[in-house]
Amino acid sequence: EKLAIFVGSPILMLAMGVLNYVRDNVQVSHTGFWDILLDFIYKQGTSFGVLARGFLFNSSLPYRDFRNFTFGPVLDYFARGSLGAIFGGKAFEHTTNSVELAIDSNSYAHNLSYLVLNKEYLKGHGIGSSYIMELYTDYGMIGVFLLSFLLGVLFIAMLQVAYRSRTILFALSLLILNNLFFMPRSSFSESFFNLFTMQFWGIVLVIIFVAKMLTKEN
């Protein structure tokens, strides 16, 4: 098993490195094994690139009467998502890369990617997001410090909950922790976004209902 992982990992990385070019119908610019492998590894380390481009294009981000990237996914879900549409809100016409999402949404990833990549963004490319830049854009350095501190407190609290026997709290902690480690390359609210969706709570209610029914039968 260890041998398979040792041998298979470079091969998989090589295949994914080639796939980066093939999916865009672009000729592979590197022909050597090590060149393709190093090119793949380099393209995975784009976290700093998001920070650098975020600072560079910060003043060029679309300005609206109300704009908040930190809680963007949650706000867009309530205002222009499936839940917002139920209460009469106008849902976004597009769910993938588009000028609409790049200008009107509260998604930092869409807003910044359109500024940086322009036409390439409309073809489906993107540079992602970073919770640090979202906090900085919305609240400045003070916001980065305070909310990062709160994240640390939340992380400790969830670890404590994980050792208790409360099933629901334990499940919620696992759900948040699943995305928390990707936050440097993702949105601030992405980790707990599912907690605000109807789909998530619908599944939770179904599980609770079925569990109670099975308990009664036993």
What are these regions (language model features)?
Residues 18-151:
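Small-residue-enriched transmembrane helix-hairpin modules in multi-pass membrane proteins
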Residues 2-17:
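Hydrophobic alpha-helical membrane-interfacial segments at the cytosolic entry of transmembrane helices
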Residues 3-7, 124-218:
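Hydrophobic alpha-helical segments
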Residues 1-2, 70, 108, 167-168:
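A diffuse structural propensity rather than consistent per-protein peaks
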